[in-house]
């Protein structure tokens, strides 16, 4: 019995952030493509000025852990709900997208918490 598109989507929805990142890497290798190239090409198609004004969803990207790595891991776990191993993997593997599609208020609050813990963070 073949898997349906819905089955695949449900399976991905149950994965942790780290598992999804590993899946993406495996798919890039298998098919010889890069997900980053598709993301970069997307905003160029529309008006960049309009996109900047209308942005309502933000991605929280950890760009550095700083000296207080343990504190950063604790905050990453709090924000994402990841387990210790997954949070440590995200902190060790910077840059790492911690959360996608966040509202501006939630993204700013998470960014502030991470910066207070000693991390460097970007909102995209």
Swiss-Prot record:
Keyword field: Ribonucleoprotein, Ribosomal protein
Compositional bias ranges of the Basic and acidic residues kind: 102-116
A Pfam family recorded for this sequence: Ribosomal_L12_N
InterPro entries the UniProt entry points to: Ribosomal_bL12 (IPR000206), Ribosomal_bL12_C (IPR013823), Ribosomal_bL12_C/ClpS-like (IPR014719), Ribosomal_bL12_oligo (IPR008932), Ribosomal_bL12_oligo_N_sf (IPR036235)
Region (Disordered): 102-124
GO BP annotations, alphabetical order: translation
Gene Ontology cellular component list: cytosolic large ribosomal subunit
Any GO molecular function: structural constituent of ribosome
Signal peptide interval: none
SUPFAM superfamilies attached to this UniProt entry: ClpS-like (SSF54736), Ribosomal protein L7/12, oligomerisation (N-terminal) domain (SSF48300)
Quaternary organization: Homodimer. Part of the ribosomal stalk of the 50S ribosomal subunit. Forms a multimeric L10(L12)X complex, where L10 forms an elongated spine to which 2 to 4 L12 dimers bind in a sequential fashion. Binds GTP-bound translation factors.
Function: Forms part of the ribosomal stalk which helps the ribosome interact with GTP-bound translation factors. Is thus essential for accurate translation.
Sequence similarity: Belongs to the bacterial ribosomal protein bL12 family.
Protein name, per record: Large ribosomal subunit protein bL12
Lineage: Bacteria, Pseudomonadati, Pseudomonadota, Gammaproteobacteria, Oceanospirillales
């Amino acid at each position: 019995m073949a898997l349906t598109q819905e089955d695949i989507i449900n399976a991905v929805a149950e994965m942790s952030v780290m598992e999804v990142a590993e899946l993406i890497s495996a798919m890039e290798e298998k098919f010889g493509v890069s997900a980053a190239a598709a993301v970069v090409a997307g905003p160029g198609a529309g008006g960049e000025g309009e996109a900047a004004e209308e942005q309502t969803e933000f991605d929280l990207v950890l760009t550095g852990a700083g000296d207080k790595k343990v504190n950063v891991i604790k905050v990453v776990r709090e924000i994402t709900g990841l387990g210790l191993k997954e949070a440590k993997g995200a902190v060790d593997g910077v840059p790492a997208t911690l959360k996608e599609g966040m509202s501006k208020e939630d993204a700013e609050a998470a960014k502030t918490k991470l910066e207070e813990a000693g991390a460097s963070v970007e909102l995209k």
